[in-house]
Swiss-Prot record:
It is found in: Cytoplasm. This is UvrABC system protein C. It holds the Pfam family HHH_5. It comes from Thermoanaerobacter sp. (strain X514). Residues 12-91 form the GIY-YIG domain. Interacts with UvrB in an incision complex. Its main location: cytoplasm. InterPro entries: GIY-YIG_endonuc, GIY-YIG_endonuc_sf, GIY-YIG_UvrC_Cho, Hlx-hairpin-Hlx_DNA-bd_motif, RuvA_2-like, UVR_dom, UVR_dom_sf, UvrABC_protein_C. PROSITE patterns: GIY_YIG, UVR, UVRC. Keywords: Cytoplasm, DNA damage, DNA excision, DNA repair, Excision nuclease, SOS response. Residues 203-238 form the UVR domain. It comes from the Bacteria. GO terms for molecular function: DNA binding; excinuclease ABC activity. GO terms for biological process: nucleotide-excision repair; SOS response.
């Protein structure tokens, strides 16, 4: 049966539709209030669809549907199918199967606390999900310091009295129920306290502990009272770090989102008893072209589908298309009413704005980390091209002059693929007459590495601090803006100084664009589409920019200095003439009338300049 024939048979009932590709793989799952209307929209208005939907439809070879009695049932089925199949074109909670939880096995006689990535219907209590394994392990460590409950899988009843206390008992992270150091009743009380702490009910827990401490003191159990007192202090210290974000004893999850071109970051603040008890951020993929409300709705469905706990209220900052339906679904899972709130003013609005700012920061940090990793990969790619393991520090050199005048050299530095401008260096060419790029390059390289040798000697003698040195750090790779002649000039200097560093010329094509690298072994053609090519082009452009900027600065100084020798020409007129003509040669060719047109010039000053260059 063709898709067109199937479309005619769609019922006017709620349900779930399943898109499949030519291999029968599920690539998209959606729900509909009316299957007939929703599914037909895809195939009857293809040109009006989002680009991502158009791509998806180009792969659809078949579809199926499942009829449900209500839209709520359709939502529940949609959540289950997305979780099971993780279809390619659905908005997905990134790597949700890997998010870790804290598990407390309250279903066991002597409960344990542990790290897990699976929620099972085993009667245990689960807390999370957390965004990282590190966060889970640090939280478990903190809980065990205050409530020393076990993590091992010993059979306590069977091993009682047969084993010795482990290391965790001696460092205060376990109360050793296996050796009867604590009776069962007191151990269960510890576990209950740990659960209250993880639930965010810390004020209630402190009140309960104070009652226990008072009772222990009245019964002259002073050691026990002191232990409880220390517990209270530890809990209060952690509570001090929690920001009071709400009045009363509210249970809220506050959700907001920030996005880049290819990923969306969802930030969740968990408020328990009116205090911020934790926060986590998660990533959603396949969100290009989607509205914020759609993305947050998808997150809510996937996040709470397997969550061990659902709060009374979810606060977010955007209208959700399925707000009422989601509220009904969450209420069913929780067992009583769950409210979804979109505040426009007041305390709740301030809270959701704060969560948005945190989502934005988390996204910026993620982008920064991804850029760092990307840069490392680019440097590795470039290093492999030139036979190095990793060119951490790359130095690039260029020469700039105007027909031999105002001759300068420049050195730019890239560390881990990024420019390090604090280590750029400028060189006035002192010993080369006229325009000779090879000799100029020899001079720059010789001076740079002689400085390095001198500074290293001073550092070894203790006469120079390493962080004060300007040239001591040596490059792993040298680039020069030029061809094989420039490369050979640099290699000759380095050889004479006993230094061995790979040198490559950054050659250009007939249109003065970066083409590749050249060395005595030949030219390396690098495809323009590679990241290594783009890094080389960036280095070449930066070396050229830095050299020509310095050259123009020097030229400008000389130009203005020469003009100041002319009667009636001060700094202001000299600058105006430089801005207008850009070179001494152009001023020499200018007529009196041309000179008079420059801002601040008059007949007398123009005549003086004209005559000065015709003596």
């Amino acid at each position: 049966m063709t898709i067109e024939e199937k479309l005619k048979l769609l019922p006017e009932k709620p349900g779930v539709y399943i898109m499949k590709d030519k291999s029968g793989k599920i690539i998209y799952v959606g729900k509909a209030v009316v299957l007939k209307n929703r599914v037909r929209q895809y195939f009857q208005n293809k040109e009006k669809q989002l680009p991502k939907v158009k791509v998806m439809l180009s792969h659809v070879e078949d579809f199926e549907y499942i009829v449900t009695d209500t839209e709520l049932e359709a939502l529940m089925l949609e959540c289950n199918l997305i979780k099971k199949y993780k279809p390619k074109y659905n908005v997905l909670l990134k790597d949700d199967k890997n998010y870790p939880y804290i598990k407390v096995t309250v279903n066991e006689e002597y409960p344990r606390i542990m790290f897990t990535r699976r929620i099972e219907p085993d009667g245990a209590k689960y807390f999370g999900p957390y965004s990282s394994a590190f966060a889970v392990r640090e939280t478990i460590k903190l809980v065990r310091k205050m409530f020393p409950i076990r993590t091992c899988n010993k059979n306590i009843e069977k091993d009682m009295g047969k084993v010795r206390e482990c290391l965790y008992y001696h460092i205060g992270l376990c109360s050793a129920p296996c050796t009867n150091k604590i009776n069962k009743e007191d151990y269960i009380k510890l576990v209950d306290q740990a659960v209250l702490f993880l639930d965010g009910k810390r004020d209630w827990l402190i009140q309960k502990l104070k009652e226990d401490m008072k009772k222990a003191a009245e019964e002259l159990r002073f050691e026990e009272a002191a232990r409880i007192r220390d517990q209270i202090f530890a809990i209060e210290r952690t509570s001090e770090k929690q920001k009071v974000v709400s009045v009363g004893e509210d249970e809220q999850d506050i959700i907001s989102m920030a996005r880049s071109a290819d990923i969306s970051c969802i930030q969740v603040f968990f408020v328990r008893d009116g205090k911020l008890s934790g926060r986590e951020h998660y990533y959603m993929k396949n969100t290009e072209g989607m509205e914020r409300g759609e993305i947050i709705s998808s997150f809510i469905k996937q996040f709470y589908e397997g969550a061990p706990y659902i709060p009374k209220e979810i606060i977010t900052d955007v209208e959700l298309d399925e707000s009422e339906l989601l509220s009904e679904w969450l209420s069913q899972k929780r067992g009583n009413k769950v409210f979804i709130t979109i505040p426009v003013r007041g305390k709740k609005k301030e809270l959701v704005d704060m969560v948005y700012q945190n989502a934005l920061e988390a996204l910026k940090n993620d982008i920064s980390i991804r850029e760092e990793i990307s840069k490392d990969q680019v440097v590795l790619e470039l290093s492999n091209l030139v036979g190095l393991d990793y060119a951490k520090r790359i130095e690039a050199y260029d020469i700039s002059n105007t027909r031999g005048q105002d001759n300068v050299g420049s050195m730019v530095v890239f560390v881990d693929g990024k420019p390090k401008k604090s280590q750029y260096r400028k060189f006035n060419i002192k010993y080369v007459e006229g325009q000779d790029d090879y000799e100029s390059m020899r001079e720059v390289i010789e001076r740079r590495f002689l400085h390095a040798i001198e500074e290293k000697e001073l550092i070894e003698k203790g006469e120079l601090e390493e962080d004060k040195a300007k040239f001591a750090e040596m490059p792993d790779l040298i680039f020069v803006d030029g061809g094989i002649g420039h490369v050979n000039a640099v290699l000759q200097v380095l050889s004479g100084l006993g230094i061995s560093i790979p040198v490559y010329g950054m050659v250009k094509d007939s249109k003065h664009r970066t083409r590749g690298l050249v060395s005595p072994q030949g030219e390396i053609d690098i495809p323009m589409t590679t990241k290594a090519f783009r890094l080389i082009a960036q280095i070449q452009e930066e070396a050229h920019r830095f050299a020509i900027t310095f050259h123009k600065e020097k030229q400008s100084k000389r130009f203005k200095s020469e003009l100041l020798n002319i009667p009636g020409i001060g700094k202001k007129r000299a600058k105006a003439l430089y801005d207008a003509f850009k070179s001494i040669e152009e001023i020499k060719r200018a007529s009196v009338e041309d000179l008079k047109k420059v801002e601040g010039m008059n007949e007398k000053a123009a005549q003086a300049v004209y005559e000065y260059f015709r003596k």
